[in-house]
A protein has these predicted regions:
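Conserved ATP/PPi-binding loop(s) of AMP-dependent carboxylate-activating enzymes
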Residues: 323-327, 333-358, 396
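Conserved AMP-binding A3 loop
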Residues: 28-31, 153-177
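ANL superfamily adenylate-forming
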Residues: 107-149, 255
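Conserved AMP-binding/adenylation subdomain of ANL enzymes
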Residues: 176-193, 201-241, 255
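Conserved pre-ATP/AMP-binding loop-to-beta segment of ANL
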Residues: 16, 121, 139-157, 163-164, ...
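Gly/Ser/Thr-rich phosphate-binding loop
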Residues: 214, 239-244, 253-316, 329
Length: 489
């Protein structure tokens, strides 16, 4: 089944059920289908057809999902574009993909990338852009593309925390099977409300939508994350299943928002996107009146690779990323996590060399993560291969050390990266972003904290750099490559 066929099926089986909740508004399944067909007609008149790429740079609003469904109704491919990206990133990514159209907010970031002809914008159009409202005013597309599940429908780009982003094409069969198999494991029903704090421009946000679509559940849209905004939306829309990151829930904990707002509807909060400290997962669960915290591990190349289940005991849900998603296999070779399965991509776009390097001789994908698998198949991450620090031949991941430093009262966020050393090969430097108004953190204070925690001295950072704002990807991952460049300069 294709994504458009899922949209059609929902409109037939439950036409008046709610497809999307947004602020005080909603769209039924029938209304969503009808509006998507009008958008599809408008895109077709711009020349978009089977196999073409349409880039979308929108927040979590109905127009994003209407564009997505319309693109699939044409047999075309969605290219999500992160909201912070500006002309330099747009020129690179849209040039690489060969995007035929670009759907964005009312103002292009800086100016239109060269060679981009068809721009559809919300609000007042500029520079010859076409207003999105004119697409909604069209008559419906009469004959949606009768597509195959093996057709490409998504073109994602890796987050580029250490390297230049790579294009990752995906067919419908694998991704939708991955989402559909997640539904019974997460026990999601069509009467529930799914909410993603992650942007729809990122795979984690799209996964939440895929799960809601496959289950028949309602999708609650949060246009931009703020702690108050997330808390208020959960209460207003009675969200049951929340997909978010640790960076979304930590300010809710620190600010007491889980007590002040109504989270009684929440059945689970699934955390992903960056390492989840077990104590954070436990603290969130303690504050949820009826909910549990889960963890999920996924990749641009895979979608959901593993997750803990609501039925799992607390130590599994809080301390691991659970067991493999149905249809996915995991193995650890020399501490390196490898994966294969139905939703795994087959090749990087226009990049055979990176494709060759990404797979083992027997067909397993090298994730770039270091991990451990328990006897029961539960996955626990120990770091990234490129983040491992090799100090005099002794290798270690800095993640556990960072977690301890992050608990210090004056630290907002920390990240440890290696720097070259003539004697030992590498030593560790810690970058610290202080909390607003906090006292300056010293290397001596960090060493005392690590000493109290019983951390082996070879793991202690030997250099401290204070940074006003940690460089982050749009999905809140630390850009360690950028930090290493700062050290070089």
């Amino acid at each position: 089944m294709t994504l458009w066929e899922l949209v059609e099926r929902r409109s037939i089986e439950a036409p008046e059920a709610i497809s999307i909740l947004f602020s005080e508004k909603h769209l039924t399944n029938r209304a969503f289908r009808d509006e998507a067909l009008r958008v599809a007609r408008g895109l077709r008149e711009l020349g978009v057809g089977r196999g073409d790429v349409v880039a979308v740079q929108l927040p979590n609003i109905p127009e994003y999902l209407l564009s997505y469904a319309a693109i699939c109704a044409l047999g075309a491919t969605l290219q999500p574009v992160h909201l912070p990206y500006r002309r330099a990133e747009l020129t690179t990514l849209l040039g690489h993909s060969g995007a035929k159209a670009f759907v964005c907010l009312s103002r292009l970031k800086d100016e239109r990338p060269p060679g981009l002809k068809n721009v559809v914008s919300l609000g007042e159009p500029e520079d010859g852009a076409i207003p999105f409202s004119s697409l909604l005013a069209k008559t419906s597309l009469e004959k949606p593309y009768d597509g195959s599940p093996d057709d490409r429908f998504l073109l994602l780009y890796t987050s580029g925390t250490t390297d230049n982003p790579k294009g990752v094409p995906h067919a419908q069969r694998g991704f939708l099977a991955n989402a559909a198999s997640s539904v019974p494991e997460l026990e999601i029903s069509r009467t529930e409300v799914v909410l993603s704090a992650a942007p729809l421009t990122h795979l984690y946000g799209l996964y939440a939508y895929h799960v809601s679509l496959c289950s028949g559940a309602t999708m609650s849209l949060l246009p931009a994350f703020t702690p108050d905004g997330l808390s208020e939306t959960v209460g207003k829309h009675k969200a049951n299943c929340i997909f978010a990151g640790p960076a979304h829930f930590k300010p809710l904990l620190d600010g007491g928002l889980l007590e002040r707002h109504d989270f009684s509807s929440v059945r689970f909060a699934c955390l992903s996107g960056s390492p989840v400290p077990p104590e954070l997962a436990a603290a969130v669960e303690k504050k949820l009146p009826k909910g549990k915290t889960l963890q999920l591990w996924g990749m641009t190349e895979l979608q959901a690779g593993s997750f803990s289940r609501p039925r799992d005991p607390a130590e599994v849900r809080h301390g691991t990323a659970g067991a493999a998603t149905p249809g996915t296999e995991l193995r650890v070779v020399d501490e390196r996590l490898q994966v294969r399965g139905v939703s795994l991509f087959s090749e990087y776009l226009k990049n055979p060399e990176e494709t060759r390097k990404a797979f083992t001789a027997d067909g397993w994908f090298e994730t770039g993560d270091t991990a451990q698998l328990s006897g029961a198949g539960h996955l626990r991450f120990t770091g990234r291969v490129k983040e491992i620090i090799n100090r005099g031949g002794v290798k270690y991941s800095p993640l556990d050390v960072e977690a301890i430093i992050d608990r210090m009262p004056d630290v907002a966020r920390s990240a440890i990266v290696p720097y070259p050393d003539v004697v030992l090969g590498e030593r560790a430097c810690v970058f610290v972003q202080p909390k607003a108004g906090a006292a300056a953190v010293t290397l001596e204070a960090i060493m005392r904290e690590l000493d109290r925690a019983g951390v082996a001295k070879f793991k202690w950072p030997e250099r401290l750099e204070r940074i006003e704002a940690m460089p982050l990807t749009p999905t809140q991952k630390v850009m360690r490559g950028r930090l290493r460049e700062l050290l070089k300069n």
